[in-house]
């Protein structure tokens, strides 16, 4: 600093000399002395606005950590048994303009990054876990289901998959083909008790593709068909290049029987040749199961997976020995006998044959014409070579023990062969004895499904690791819009509360806890808006209960009364009643039970085991850019759960009416309301501080600019605006519904107002300032059309930009000063790309606000127009 090099960065040079020695505070010679010389220099910022890059000082974070431990103590005392999970989302830091990071859900690049991330997280959280490459959700309009990469591991610490070198790399070609697939499946069949003779080779449907080829124009070839559908074009080219007579993979009909596994035949029409259903999915999803011998509905051998809410699940076995299935004379299979498969044979041990199966249970018995065949095995394990790698498609099973037994057999075989494989297909059954961590794609983001945490320390450790490992994978937690606005990833950071087992769920044990949370969130709109994303409103991903239907609050009060009646009458509430009472209320306008601020579709839905998990998902949380900001959100919820566990919240529901989209859209009122939340937590004994959430407010309601004129101060901040889904329109080969994001809102706050002399106008219209409780201070919202798309509400209304604000002196009929806010670049420049970093984004924001631009001369403004529906907002579309 003595050279003055940092003066341009805002530092104040204390001494500037050509020679640094001449600026030294001490010079000259010294004699020996015992005096010790020391110096200290500190730099303190006079003022620092809250920022997301470093949201908390170390002193603040120590207080947050201490409070987290204190809440843990209360949760332990109350025997709450609370666990918390989450679903953080991430975007690419290298390709912000890519379609997969803005619109689409799946891409090759996203798949590679997802694979790298799941392996990193597996190494941190779950060494020895099973890495499963499965199929995820399938949404209308998407050609294939989305991928779902997951790691499963046992809570008792016993590894499921021991050798990581046997997990194939998706980016590597090992040169494996159909011959390797057949050998692997043959060895596996012999090991677990099946018969290699029951392997069925699978082929692409030659008749279908021959018919398809006959429909091509005469001037194209299958390799270059010029079809409009890119995926169809690539599929046909790939199949004809590999040949219609090439084996796609092998299938082994397999099911659990007794203490082992048995295989059988499918008695297909074409000499046991398996013609796959045309498509791009793994062969396990394309098996022609309708070609397997017919079975009457009353005789169908349904698989009944274990219930995760069963409190009597035993401990999982530490090891999985295999029984060798002994086969007597041809056509007379037996039940699994004693022994340990291939290992037993190598030791010279012979399994003893048991009694032959009766014909109505024999999987090798061919059914007569018209005869129902319930004995036919209808599940299969498939091995498919794909891009030089072997993919094993797991069959559905009933219990976790069966699944782990089969996985242990697979690892034994691939260890002997030295062949790395990829496990796909069916996932392990839902089981509280297993933990799961998953990475899945969503439109514009990659989502991580965290495993639940029991304590604050676990939650802190796991959240920080996930953020850091994502950063190492070149995935970030923030985006910048074209105009430079700083936003989250665009995805959620949903919080899931429950327990290790469904029967321990605090929501099922104390349904009044759900009532308390619902009522408190409805009473305090700041909890809905402060942590949410840009897309809010009645048709958003997480609408409030009072946004969707007008009668929701009345019906919710009836449900609360019924809940109280059951508790008072019987002393408890059965778990299914909680689902029945609230399932049809916690929905969006279309009736979707998942798209709700409080989603209970995994609480205790009776129709499936996966719906009876005792979980409540809170979906109105956007991804914050810093891990500690996310943890602060979790801490608020943990504090409220601890508070309501001891003191249920039974206040009346508030009929906000249009206020919910008027007053509560403004940051001033959200801040006031959230201060009340902090006050309630303090009264409960939890010393939260409002300053801990200043970064959240600054991130959610960024400051646009300010103006100071004659002791009057004006501040502009971004406010909230609900986006509405419009009506159906034809487009894209089907029916589409657009989202209208063309309307925006900002807040204007004025300080130093004296009486009625001064008014504030926007584009010549008086702004309806409302008192805030502080003398001389007023606040209002301005709603305006930012841009004019062809499809929106009121499409004939043009953009109101730029917004010119005047500080109007009613005595002199003049503007004494003003400022101007541009929605886009003031010079008319249209940005083609997103900002590359925060500096460019800041430059774009600063370029759109000017502290000048008032209206000159004497002006006459119209009287204030009162809007009874939205009294706090000046809607420029209506004036």
Q: For the regions a protein language model found, what residue spans apply to each?
A:
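Short hydrophobic transmembrane-like helices used for membrane targeting/insertion
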Residues: 12, 26, 30, 41-43
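Aromatic (phenylalanine/tyrosine) cluster motif
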Residues: 6, 37-39
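C-terminal accessory/tail domains of diverse enzymes
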Residues: 43-421, 427-444, 450-489, 500-879
């Amino acid at each position: 600093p003595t050279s003055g090099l940092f003066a341009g960065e805002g530092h104040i040079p204390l001494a500037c000399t050509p020679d640094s020695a001449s600026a030294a505070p001490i010079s000259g010679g010294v004699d020996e002395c015992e005096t010790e010389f020391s110096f200290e220099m500190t730099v303190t910022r006079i003022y620092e606005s809250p920022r997301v890059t470093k949201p908390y000082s170390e002193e603040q974070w120590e207080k947050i950590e201490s409070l987290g431990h204190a809440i843990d103590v209360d949760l332990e005392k109350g025997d709450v048994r609370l666990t918390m999970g989450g679903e953080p989302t991430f975007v690419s830091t290298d390709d912000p303009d890519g379609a997969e990071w803005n619109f689409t859900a799946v891409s090759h690049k996203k798949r590679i990054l997802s694979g790298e991330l799941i392996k990193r997280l597996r190494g941190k959280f779950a060494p020895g876990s099973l890495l499963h490459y499965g199929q995820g959700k399938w949404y209308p309009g998407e050609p294939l289901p989305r991928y779902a990469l997951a790691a499963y591991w046992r809570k008792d610490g016993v590894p499921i998959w021991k050798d990581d070198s046997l997990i194939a790399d998706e980016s590597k070609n090992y040169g494996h083909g159909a011959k390797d697939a057949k050998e692997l499946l043959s060895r596996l069949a012999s090991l677990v008790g099946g018969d290699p003779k029951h392997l069925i080779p699978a082929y692409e449907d030659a008749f279908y593709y021959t018919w398809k080829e006959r429909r091509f124009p005469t001037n194209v070839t299958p390799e270059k068909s010029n079809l409009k559908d890119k995926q169809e074009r690539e599929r046909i080219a790939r199949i004809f290049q590999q040949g219609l007579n090439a084996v796609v993979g092998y299938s082994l009909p397999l099911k659990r029987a007794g203490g082992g596994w048995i295989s059988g035949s499918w008695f297909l029409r074409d000499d046991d040749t398996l013609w796959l259903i045309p498509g791009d999915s793994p062969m396990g999803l394309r098996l022609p199961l309708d070609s397997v011998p017919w079975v009457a509905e009353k005789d169908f051998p349904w698989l009944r997976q274990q219930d995760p809410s069963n409190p009597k699940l035993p401990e999982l076995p530490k090891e999985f020995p295999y029984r060798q299935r002994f086969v007597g004379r041809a056509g007379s299979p037996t039940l699994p006998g004693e022994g340990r498969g291939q290992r037993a044979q190598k030791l010279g041990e012979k399994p003893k044959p048991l009694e032959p199966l009766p014909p109505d249970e024999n999987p090798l018995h061919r059914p007569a014409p018209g005869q129902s065949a319930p004995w036919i095995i209808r599940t299969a394990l498939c091995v498919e070579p794909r891009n030089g790698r072997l993919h094993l498609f797991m069959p559905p099973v009933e219990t976790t023990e069966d699944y782990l037994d089969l996985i242990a057999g697979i690892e034994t075989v691939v260890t002997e062969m030295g062949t790395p494989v990829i496990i796909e297909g069916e996932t392990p059954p839902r089981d509280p004895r297993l933990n799961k961590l998953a990475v899945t794609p969503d439109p514009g983001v990659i989502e991580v499904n965290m495993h639940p945490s029991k304590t604050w320390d676990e939650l802190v450790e796991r959240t920080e690791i996930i953020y850091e490992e994502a950063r190492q994978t070149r995935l970030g937690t923030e985006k910048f819009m074209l105009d430079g606005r700083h936003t989250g990833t665009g995805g959620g950071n949903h919080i899931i509360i429950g327990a290790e087992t469904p029967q321990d769920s605090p929501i099922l044990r104390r349904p009044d806890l759900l009532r308390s949370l619902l009522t408190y969130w409805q009473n305090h709109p700041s909890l809905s808006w402060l942590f949410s994303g840009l897309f809010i409103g009645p048709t958003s991903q997480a609408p409030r209960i009072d946004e969707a239907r007008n009668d929701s609050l009345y019906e919710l009060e009836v449900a609360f009364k019924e809940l109280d009646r059951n508790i008072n009458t019987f002393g408890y509430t059965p778990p299914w009643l909680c689902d029945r009472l609230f399932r049809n209320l916690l929905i969006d306008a279309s009736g979707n039970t998942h798209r709700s601020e409080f989603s209970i579709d995994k609480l205790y839905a009776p129709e499936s085991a996966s719906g009876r998990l005792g979980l409540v998902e809170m979906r109105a949380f956007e991804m914050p850019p810093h891990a500690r900001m996310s943890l602060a959100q979790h801490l608020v919820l943990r504090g409220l759960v601890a508070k309501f566990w001891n003191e249920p919240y039974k206040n009346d529901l508030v009929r906000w009416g249009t206020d919910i989209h008027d007053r509560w859209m403004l940051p001033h009122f959200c801040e006031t309301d959230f201060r009340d939340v902090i006050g309630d937590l303090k009264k409960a004994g939890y010393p939260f501080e409002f300053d801990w959430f200043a970064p959240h407010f600054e991130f959610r309601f960024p400051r646009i600019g300010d103006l100071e004129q004659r002791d009057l101060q004006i501040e502009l901040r971004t406010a909230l605006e609900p986006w509405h889904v419009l009506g159906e329109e034809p487009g894209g080969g089907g029916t589409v519904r657009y989202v209208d994001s063309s309307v925006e809102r900002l807040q204007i706050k004025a300080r130093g107002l004296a009486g009625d002399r001064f008014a504030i106008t926007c584009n010549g219209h008086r702004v309806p300032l409302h008192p805030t409780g502080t003398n001389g201070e007023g606040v209002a919202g301005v709603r305006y059309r930012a841009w004019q798309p062809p499809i929106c509400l009121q499409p004939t209304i043009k953009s109101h930009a730029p917004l010119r604000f005047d500080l109007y002196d009613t005595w002199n009929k003049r503007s004494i000063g003003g400022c101007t806010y541009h929605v886009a670049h003031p010079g008319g420049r249209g940005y083609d790309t997103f900002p590359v970093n925060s500096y460019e984004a800041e430059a774009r924001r600063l370029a759109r606000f000017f502290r000048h631009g008032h209206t000159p001369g004497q002006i006459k403004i119209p009287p204030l127009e009162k809007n009874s529906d939205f009294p706090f907002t000046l809607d420029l579309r209506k004036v």
